Regions:
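Short, small/polar-rich loop/turn modules that mediate ligand/substrate recognition or access, typified
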Residues: 83, 167, 172, 229-231
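Substrate-binding pocket helix/loop in short-chain dehydrogenase/reductase
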Residues: 93-94, 98-106, 199
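Active-site helix of classical SDR
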Residues: 117, 151, 159
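Alpha-helical segment proximal to the catalytic Tyr-Lys
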Residues: 122, 164-168, 227
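Residue(s) in the substrate-gating loop at a strand-loop-helix junction
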Residues: 135
């Protein structure tokens, strides 16, 4: 049975992706640091077409990548897909991001995916896929969240490099760059009106994206249907990054983007 290793699998995009793979008959090793949420996620998937193997662990820990891949091989005898999804967000601008926060972001969203890919590459068979979950904020600049954008942009670079290096071995590497998706990670930001308008009012599709939208894109990039797609970063954002579209409400709104502390404004 084909097998996928999916990080951040206890909620949001990760859980939706796990469910999609399971519905398609692909076994899933789901990784999350939250044991209770992960067990609940596994229970919610019990009636689907393939087994869900929960693995509660911190993916930034040195031993986790090897242990996660080992579990997949022990349970099903193979590993075919890796989805690096786990992440965390922060609205902090560069000038107020300390080294501890910077290390946290780079460890979780760049170093851990790198190390997981390294372990998975050694375990893959003749054909396999890696899909990294990036962000539209790795494609365009934003007003805050510099460490997040930097980590995700690094993930894009890793994606392209692996596509070039391992494509001839039958291993495809792509990324999805979701727009702002309502999830437990983003719900606190969606309470801020300016943030909601910045994202919703600039989306031509005129709706919020869903975790299912992203899961479908990840599945597509992992399936034979995308067999000639390699080294791409697919924006899953309703057109947000492709246009300067603005609704009337956004065009008529007051602009409030000046830094509170002008000592960091470059003036």
């Amino acid at each position: 049975m084909r097998t996928a290793l999916i990080t951040g699998a206890s909620s949001g995009i990760g859980l939706a992706t796990a469910r999609k793979f399971l519905e398609e008959g692909v076994a899933v090793v789901g990784v999350s640091r939250d044991r209770a949420k992960l067990d609940a996620a596994a229970d919610s998937c019990a009636d689907l077409s393939a087994p869900f193997f929960p693995f509660a662990a911190d993916i930034t820990a040195d031993e986790t990548p090897a242990r996660a891949v080992k579990l997949a091989l022990e349970e099903t005898g193979r590993l075919d897909h890796l989805v690096n999804n786990a992440g965390v967000g922060s609205p902090q601008p560069v000038h107020s991001t300390d080294d501890e926060m910077l290390d946290q972001f780079l460890d979780l969203m760049l170093r851990a995916p790198f190390r997981l890919a390294r372990e998975a590459l050694a375990a893959f068979g003749d054909t396999a896929t890696i899909v990294n979950v990036s962000s539209t904020y790795a494609l365009v600049g934003g007003l805050r969240g510099g460490a997040y954008s930097a980590a995700k942009a690094g993930l894009n670079g890793l994606t392209l490099h692996m596509a070039a290096q391992y494509g001839s071995s039958g291993i495809r590497s792509n990324a999805v760059a979701p727009g702002v998706i309502p999830t437990p990670m983003t719900e606190h930001r969606l309470e801020v009106e300016a943030f909601r308008r910045m994202n919703y009012d600039m989306t031509p599709s005129a709706r919020w994206g869903t975790v299912q939208d992203v899961a479908e894109a990840i599945w597509f990039l992992s399936s034979p249907a995308s067999g000639w797609i390699n080294g791409q970063v697919l924006a899953v954002d309703g057109g947000w990054t492709s246009t300067k579209f603005l609704t009337e409400s956004a065009l008529s709104s007051d602009r409030d983007d000046q830094p509170a502390d002008w000592s960091h404004s470059g003036r």
